[in-house]
């Protein structure tokens, strides 16, 4: 799913670049051959969200596939750097609207690609489902932004529906996992992994060996497995799948 989201973001970047270099084909120029300022704003916002979605989804895909470490990656001043990049994108969007410069356009793309990486790397693997849902929302808003540039009503409607539903789902998932929705958007809650269970530290811990689990499974007539936050923290989804396959065979 994360890989598909990356393609949506990349497509938004390509469409925005095509509209910028051949505006006449998209009907977004005035009688003097200049691109409408409103189209430049829509283009810059769409390409920024698309680029963030692309690199963010790639990082999420690599973490979920185990190709890179799922542990949060943080460094000093990370949030200040993210804030600086965000403010820089706003300033560049204003400059791009006034000057319509190719250099500024690709600078927006470059900074957005970097911001997409920085937003996702501090998030732990256990919280990736929320990240994927949020990236789904980003891809929807990227599509909607390009829809405004192309004056495509269908793209605007579908993109808005995907963006809104993804944001709502992310909020619900954050509430269920005792996470801050704002922290998800800002990409800074991965280092807090495990804090959601601190209030339950006084409860009795039930331990068991693999032999105990095997004995219970072998004598059970039916088994219901409910994946939860603990499975995500332990990154046990692959082992759970293997166990389910073996249970079905026997």
Predicted regions and their residues:
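Structured cytosolic domains appended to multi-pass membrane proteins
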Residues: 199-250
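Structured alpha-helical segments in the cores of large, soluble enzyme domains
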Residues: 110, 114-117, 141-145, 209-215
